[in-house]
């Protein structure tokens, strides 16, 4: 069959156009109707128009259906027939937080991201009916224009892009194509379970709407497109405002937000959270973020969870924190100092120390870092966490309480317990990357050690 001039061209031409210059694709392949049609179209494209097209398929084994193993076998046979490399990935689903559907989707896209090669783009097979369902589900949740934008035909994904080339076509069109090409596909019996919201819409709601209004799905897609346009316009209009309100550490100025209207402030907050990879907050979460975190009394240490991220406030700025690994020990022995074999007055430097809770590595280096006095031969070096008592630091004439020291140096509360403290014996020598105590001060014109903390990009 010559697909360039035949009826299936209605599906093939948009796919050809959307691929552009991309010649390496990874296809999400469940074995169902939609992804089978997409994979077949790509095979035809490779045969007739783009012989250099490199196609890989990925099948996600969710382990939720008794037939899952037989689906893997079907996908392997199909890919073998079409000479396509197939990757099968087994995932574990944890439905406790957002339910099975959301958990499966999250696991699926994590697997896609982990297996997407350097030059590849990801292709998935959502169609017009899926778009309509997504719009209605967002409407049910009370979403704004961002949520009602539903699914984009093209969007950034991992280090590359995600393309949905079938988004403008109904399931009926795909089914007609599959039957005409005598394709075989899997029918997932769980799709008939209307306890799931998406199935409920597909089985019980959309047939009635489409019977009454045959072009309901197309109209819904147009509305989703208009919402997406409005969001894109807001992104462009607010980009400069967001940049002006952000500090070098990507914290957000509360004083700057106070100058904005309520609507503009909410829009900026949403974009700030999205730019840092947080899930879209609900209206209630956004109100709590402002009232309970940003507007909390000055001596409070407010916090709010959004997904797995934590919003905190410090010095009139908002911070979005990644989940922080727990520090399970407050004391880490490092080394007992030994004399150098050449009888040098400078003892041997200890080997680098790997810190717990993803805090990086401490080491002594030949130059740079923090200059501290050398440890004496036989002196025990350790690292501890949790500054306590009165501290005398270099550059201050008087001792200060530990809390005052952190405040004066501008260290946010959530970082204070995660900063390694260097001890020689029972003497505090330095807080890595922050200060050196008078007890740890290197004497001028005398040899010294240089403490370097190779820490992760974000301490919190």
From Swiss-Prot:
GO molecular function, one term: ATP binding
UniProt xrefs under CDD domains: TilS_N (cd01992)
SUPFAM superfamilies, A to Z: Adenine nucleotide alpha hydrolases-like, MesJ substrate recognition domain-like, PheT/TilS domain
Record's keyword terms, sorted: ATP-binding, Cytoplasm, Ligase, Nucleotide-binding, tRNA processing
GO BP terms in the entry: tRNA modification
List of residues binding ATP: 30-35
Enzyme Commission no: 6.3.4.19
Catalytic activity annotation: cytidine(34) in tRNA(Ile2) + L-lysine + ATP = lysidine(34) in tRNA(Ile2) + AMP + diphosphate + H(+)
GO cellular component: cytoplasm
Location in or out of the cell: Cytoplasm
Pfam family, one: TilS
Gene3D superfamilies: 1.20.59.20, HUPs
EC class: ligase
Free-text comment on this protein's domains from its UniProt entry: The N-terminal region contains the highly conserved SGGXDS motif, predicted to be a P-loop motif involved in ATP binding.
Family to which the UniProt record says this protein belongs: Belongs to the tRNA(Ile)-lysidine synthase family.
Role according to the record: Ligates lysine onto the cytidine present at position 34 of the AUA codon-specific tRNA(Ile) that contains the anticodon CAU, in an ATP-dependent manner. Cytidine is converted to lysidine, thus changing the amino acid specificity of the tRNA from methionine to isoleucine.
PANTHER family per the UniProt record, alphabetical: TRNA(ILE)-LYSIDINE SYNTHASE-RELATED (PTHR43033:SF1)
Protein name per its UniProtKB record: tRNA(Ile)-lysidine synthase
The organism of origin for this protein: Yersinia pseudotuberculosis serotype I (strain IP32953)
Name of the gene this protein is made from: tilS
């Amino acid at each position: 069959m010559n697909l360039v001039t035949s009826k299936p061209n209605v599906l093939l031409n948009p796919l050809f156009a959307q691929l552009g210059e991309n010649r390496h694709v990874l296809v999400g392949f469940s074995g169902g109707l939609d992804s089978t049609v997409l994979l077949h179209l790509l095979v035809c494209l490779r045969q007739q128009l783009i012989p250099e097209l490199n196609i890989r398929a990925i099948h996600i084994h969710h382990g939720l259906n008794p037939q899952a193993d037989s689906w893997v076998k079907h996908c392997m046979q199909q890919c073998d027939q079409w000479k396509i490399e197939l990757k099968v990935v087994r995932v574990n689903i944890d439905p406790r937080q957002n339910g099975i559907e959301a958990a499966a989707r999250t696991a699926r896209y994590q697997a896609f991201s982990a297996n997407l090669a350097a030059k590849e783009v990801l292709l998935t097979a959502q169609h017009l009916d899926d778009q309509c369902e997504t719009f209605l589900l967002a409407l049910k949740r009370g979403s704004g224009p961002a949520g009602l934008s539903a699914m984009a035909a093209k969007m950034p994904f991992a280090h590359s892009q995600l393309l949905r080339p079938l988004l403008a076509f109904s399931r009926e069109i795909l089914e007609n194509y599959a039957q005409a090409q005598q394709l075989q596909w899997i029918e997932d019996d769980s799709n008939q379970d209307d306890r799931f919201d998406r199935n409920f819409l597909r089985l019980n709601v959309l047939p009635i709407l489409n019977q009454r209004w045959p072009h309901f799905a197309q109209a819904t897609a147009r509305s989703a497109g208009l919402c997406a346009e409005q969001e894109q316009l807001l992104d462009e209009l607010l980009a400069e405002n967001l940049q002006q309100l952000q500090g070098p550490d990507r914290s957000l100025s509360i004083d700057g937000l106070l100058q904005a209207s309520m609507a503009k402030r909410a829009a900026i907050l949403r974009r700030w959270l999205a730019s840092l990879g947080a899930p879209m907050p609900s209206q209630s979460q956004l109100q709590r973020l402002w009232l309970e975190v940003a507007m909390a009394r000055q001596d409070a240490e407010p916090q709010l969870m959004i997904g797995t991220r934590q919003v905190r406030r410090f010095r009139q700025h908002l911070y979005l924190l990644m989940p922080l690994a727990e520090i399970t020990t407050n004391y880490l022995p490092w080394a007992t100092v030994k004399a150098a074999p050449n009888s040098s007055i400078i003892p041997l430097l200890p080997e680098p120390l790997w810190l717990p809770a993803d805090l990086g590595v401490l080491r002594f280096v030949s130059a740079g870092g923090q200059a501290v006095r050398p440890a004496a031969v036989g002196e025990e070096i350790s690292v501890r966490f949790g500054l306590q008592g009165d501290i005398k630091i270099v550059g201050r004439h008087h001792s200060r309480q530990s809390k005052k020291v952190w405040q004066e140096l501008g260290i946010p509360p959530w970082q204070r317990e995660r900063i390694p403290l260097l001890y020689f014996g029972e003497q505090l020598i330095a807080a890595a990357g922050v200060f050196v105590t008078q007890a740890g001060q290197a004497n001028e014109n005398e040899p010294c050690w240089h403490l370097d903390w190779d820490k992760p990009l974000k301490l919190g």
